[in-house]
């Protein structure tokens, strides 16, 4: 089981929102670098860096902070938010991202997304499958499509896609528990996929249950920031 720390950034601070709603935005840390160092000391190997301003507000990508985080830590960074062109994807990698997660691009321009897969490699590109009421949402979860998530995965799976990040938006940042049945359904249909799951984690028991159903990559965030998962619990779990 690979535990991935969720680090949402707005105005160079660590924040979290519930189900993508900016009205619920809550600040947690003034210094992203100090937080990353803390995760590194605990044994976390990967972070999911969400550039929230770029994703939802069309602000300039915070590549300066991305570069700083990559220089001050050995943690691998999966960067997401506002990467709507191949040039921005390239800039993310140049500035220290180990992976990038793309959600809007595969919907708006399949050919550019497929070109990203072949240019940077299938291991470095993750497709976001962000679900609200059984359909995809894109553009920082602001635009509801009529696209069926499984049809979306089908198309790119047939093109060689290896990595997906699946989020039930209604669960994200809520501490309401993960959508276990959704994950089981996708695991069963796409056993070859490397699936990253995120949203709803309440405690260590949720993480253990996800492992039991076959999930290998779990993003956690609010449960740690709100101390539902303690430092000792996280450190002990990472040592297993």
Locate each region found by the language model:
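Hydrophobic faces of well-ordered beta-strands that scaffold small-molecule active sites
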Residues: 3-9, 47-49, 77-81, 100-102, ...
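Conserved anion-binding
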Residues: 10-24, 90, 97-172
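Short, acidic/polar
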Residues: 28-40, 85-90, 144-155, 207
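Glycine-rich, proline-tolerant flexible connector loops at the mouths of alpha/beta enzymes
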Residues: 46-64, 104, 165-176
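Glycine/small-residue-rich loop that forms an oxyanion/phosphate-binding "nest" at active or ligand-binding sites
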Residues: 53, 61-118
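Charged helix-capping and loop-helix junction motifs
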Residues: 60-67, 142-151, 176-184
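Catalytic cores of alpha/beta
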Residues: 73, 77-99, 182-217
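Glycine-rich phosphate-binding active-site loops on the catalytic face of alpha/beta enzymes
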Residues: 91-112, 168-171, 199-203, 213-233
């Amino acid at each position: 089981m690979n535990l991935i720390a969720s680090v949402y950034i707005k105005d160079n601070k660590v924040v979290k929102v519930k189900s993508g709603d900016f009205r619920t935005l809550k600040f947690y840390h003034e210094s992203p670098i100090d937080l990353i160092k803390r995760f590194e000391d605990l044994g976390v190997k990967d972070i999911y860096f969400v550039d929230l301003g770029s994703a939802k507000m069309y602000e300039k990508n915070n590549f300066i902070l991305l570069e700083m985080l990559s220089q001050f830590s050995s943690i691998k960074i999966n960067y997401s938010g506002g990467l709507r062109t191949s040039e921005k994807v390239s800039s993310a990698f140049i500035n220290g991202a180990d992976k990038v997660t793309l959600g809007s691009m595969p919907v708006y321009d399949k050919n550019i997304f497929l070109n990203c897969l072949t240019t940077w490699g299938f291991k470095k590109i993750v497709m976001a499958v962000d679900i609200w009421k059984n359909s995809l949402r894109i553009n920082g979860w602001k635009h509801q499509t009529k696209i069926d998530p499984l049809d979306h995965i089908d198309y790119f799976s047939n093109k060689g896609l290896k990595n997906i990040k699946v989020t039930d938006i209604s669960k994200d940042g809520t501490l309401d528990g993960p959508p276990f049945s959704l994950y089981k359904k996708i695991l069963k249909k796409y056993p070859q996929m490397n699936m990253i799951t995120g949203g709803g984690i309440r405690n260590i028991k949720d993480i253990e249950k996800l492992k039991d159903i076959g999930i290998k990559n779990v993003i956690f965030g609010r449960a740690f920031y709100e101390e539902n998962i303690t430092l000792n619990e996280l450190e002990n779990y990472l040592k297993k």
